[in-house]
């Protein structure tokens, strides 16, 4: 177990290999403002997507999602995305689509819509539809084999979350 800010953050598992799956990467402890996180091989550095709230506790309506790194492969420190990562790789765009509802898109994969809205529990969640199944998204794993920084060879994307109607954990994998 790895402590960060006096909290256990994740349980370390086996290192990434060519047969890596989402379950071989560390699962993060719950965090009240985190919407979901992304992990990808070849290392355990994790991209965090969390609610962007002001000191008054209100959601920033212009930029409702804050994205940053937890650099586990280094010292486990929090680090902001750099300009290239934010604008071309891991950043998101947000557009209001209703009261307390936002269309969220990855800058690197705009054709996959995500929705930020309040769930039945009254809290904000990111919802995604994969293979005709809606889920409240909790984590994404991206399997990369070769390619370049600008054009990685993505073998698959695996998403985990919960079914909003049953509360059961679901997992879906697709090839982008």
Regions found by a protein language model. Give the residues of each.
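N-terminal export/targeting and maturation segments
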Residues: 1-81
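Structural signature of eukaryotic scaffold interfaces centered on beta-propeller domains
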Residues: 24-28, 40, 94-97, 149-151
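Short, hydrophobic/aromatic-rich segments at coil-to-beta transitions
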Residues: 33, 156-158
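A generic structural motif
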Residues: 39-40, 160-162
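Generic detection of short hydrophobic beta-strand segments and adjacent strand-loop junctions
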Residues: 49-51, 112, 172-176
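Predominantly extracellular/secreted and cell-surface proteins with exposed
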Residues: 70-122
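Acidic, glycine-rich flexible loop segments
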Residues: 112-155, 163-166
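Short, low-complexity, Pro/Ser/Thr/Gly-rich segments in the mature regions of secreted, periplasmic
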Residues: 161-176
